[in-house]
Amino acid sequence: MTDFFRITNDSVHIEIKAFPNSPKNEFTGVRENRLCVRIAAPPEDGKANACLCGFLAKTLGCAKRDVVLVKGEKSRLKTVAVPVEYVEKLRGITGDI
């Protein structure tokens, strides 16, 4: 179940499939080695990306500035980086889905 992220020297890169315009922010599972995340914001003017980063920060208990969109600014397939110290909380997410 942890195939959706990889650990580098100082960060964890999370592979995400985002579903904007959803009724609420929530994790829906892991499919095709990506963490599936429903996002309540629309995919316009970076609103969904900001909402996704904020949701991840809140869930992991880190600052919003620690969640960085690495790839996929205009795509549903995204890569997000968080500091490596949050890897255990990230593993816990999959146990809750």
Q: Where do the language-model regions lie?
A:
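Short acidic/glycine-enriched loop/turn segments that link adjacent beta-strands
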Residues: 74-76
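C-terminal catalytic core of tyrosine-transesterase DNA break-rejoin enzymes
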Residues: 59
